A protein has these predicted regions:
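Transmembrane-helix bundle of Major Facilitator Superfamily
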Residues: 2-187
Length: 187
């Protein structure tokens, strides 16, 4: 068995898939922070609407993480991760093409529901895949690093995309990532 075959059938591939689906979740927590002037101008937003667009993601996600973890215990975390990834991808499309403040707020709320499904599913997958304590600690460190790194990278990515593309591009980048991860997860 070649090194590639070993990797493809290993728990390290599972970790790669898990952190790849988790990365957009953490990026989306901060990607819009640099987009506020562009969003305000493009959608003619009030200060209240702008606050809701930014804050709804964290508020909804924080409120749903525990219930989604309990749901994952019932239906299985792989299924929860797939459903969350599909919802996150579809909500990203809706957010990217929103034409009103309330459509964007609703899309960000749906993004948060998908994120609340993905977060406990990825953490549980890491916990249940790596049974050796030393490997599990290493894998959890990678998972946490991706989360923190994604949140730190969000404003940089948002600034770059806003400089070169329409504001909706900050959401469109999620779609191919979610599509690839869902395909890998199902097959």
């Amino acid at each position: 068995m070649s090194n590639l075959e070993k990797f493809m059938s290993s728990k390290w591939l599972i970790l790669a898939i898990v952190v790849l689906i988790y990365l957009p979740v953490s990026i989306d927590a901060t990607v819009l922070h640099v987009a506020t002037p562009t969003l305000s101008e493009s959608l003619s937003l009030s200060a209240n609407q702008l606050l809701w667009i930014i804050d709804i993601y964290s508020l909804v996600m924080a409120g749903l993480i525990l219930p989604m973890g309990a749901l994952g215990d019932r239906i299985g975390f792989k299924k929860l991760m797939i459903i969350g990834g599909i919802l996150f991808g579809l909500a990203s499309l809706a957010a990217a093409f929103s034409t009103t403040a309330w459509a964007l707020i609703g899309s960000r709320a749906l993004l948060a529901v998908g994120a609340a499904m993905i977060l406990p599913a990825t953490l549980s997958t890491v916990r249940n895949t790596f049974l050796d304590e030393k490997q599990r600690n290493f894998a959890l460190g990678i998972w946490a690093t991706v989360g923190g790194g994604g949140a730190a990278f969000g404003p940089l990515l948002g600034g770059f995309l806003l400089e070169h593309f329409h504001w909706g591009s900050v959401f469109l980048i999620n779609v191919p990532i979610m599509l690839a991860v869902i395909i890998f997860t199902i097959f």
